[in-house]
Design a protein with these regions (language model features):
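Surface-exposed flexible segments
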Residues: 84-86, 160
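Detector for outer-membrane/organellar transmembrane beta-barrel domains
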Residues: 99-191
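Residue-level detector of functional hotspots within protein domains
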Residues: 33-35, 48, 76, 92, ...
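Conformationally flexible catalytic loops at phosphate/diphosphate-handling active centers
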Residues: 79
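Outer membrane beta-barrel
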Residues: 1-72, 82-84, 91-99, 168-188
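Outer-membrane beta-barrel and related beta-rich outer-membrane complex signature
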Residues: 16-21, 74-76, 116, 157
C-alpha cells in the first residue's frame, strides 16, 4: 500500500516528532531532541511517500520525505544552493504476545546547514509496550529510547560529530496514575 502526502506536516523523525507536545508523556522535550531539531521539531512543507510492505508476520513501513528546510532547527538551514531536507524512515512493529509489542525504527536525514554544507543525522528508536488485555485501563508499562548521531560538515576540512539519547519508562499503577522517569544525554550538533 502506497500513500502520498503533500503539504505541511511533522516529519517522521523517530517517535516523538510526529506527536504534538501536549500528547507526550513528559512535561518538557528531551534535550537530545531539542538540540538536533529545536523546540518545534521538523515541521515543513514538502512531500512524503510511505509504503506499507506486504509482510504477514509483522508491520513494516518505509517512508521517504523531502521538505523545505524552513524549520528553526539547530541542525538544518535553508541554504542558497540546497533548499531541501531528505529523510528516510523504516518502522518495524512486532506483536510479541496479546499483551506486549515492540517497535524498532531507523531514520536517516540529510540537509543543508548554515555553512552551505550538509548535516547528516542517523537515529534509532526502540519502544516496548506491555498492556494486559484483562486490565488494560488500569495497568501498563512502556519503555522508549531514542539515539541520535550527527555529522555536520562545515568545510572540506571541518566536520563536527555529536551524539545524544534519551530513555524513559512509564508505569501505569492505576486508571489515571502513572510513574514516569527519563534520562537524557545530549551534545550540540554544531561547533560552538
Amino acid at each position: 500500500k502506497l500513500l502520498l502526502k503533500v503539504g505541511t506536516f511533522l516529519q517522521d523523525v523517530v517517535r516523538i516528532n510526529p506527536v504534538h507536545p501536549h500528547a507526550l508523556p513528559f512535561i518538557d522535550l528531551p534535550a537530545a531532541y531539542v538540540n538536533y531539531f529545536g523546540e518545534e521539531g521538523l515541521n515543513d512543507e514538502g512531500a512524503s511517500l510511505s509504503w506499507l510492505t506486504p509482510t504477514k508476520s509483522f508491520y513494516q513501513e518505509l517512508v521517504f520525505q523531502a521538505t523545505a528546510a524552513a524549520s528553526e532547527s539547530p541542525s538544518f538551514y535553508r541554504g542558497d544552493n540546497n533548499h531541501f531536507i531528505y529523510l528516510g524512515h523504516l518502522k518495524n512493529f512486532f506483536t510479541l504476545s496479546d499483551n506486549a509489542t515492540l517497535e524498532f525504527g531507523l531514520t536517516g536525514i540529510t540537509g543543508p546547514n548554515d555553512s552551505s554544507k550538509n548535516t547528516n543525522i542517523g537515529a534509532v528508536d526502540l519502544t516496548y509496550k506491555w498492556k494486559p488485555v484483562q486490565m488494560n485501563t488500569y495497568k501498563s508499562f512502556t519503555w522508549q529510547s531514542e539515539f541520535f548521531y550527527s555529522n555536520a560538515n562545515y568545510s572540506s576540512a571541518n566536520a563536527h560529530n555529536s551524539f545524544g539519547l534519551y530513555s524513559f519508562v512509564e508505569d501505569q499503577v492505576a486508571k489515571r496514575w502513572f510513574l514516569t522517569g527519563r534520562y537524557d544525554y545530549a551534545e550540540r550538533p554544531y561547533n560552538n
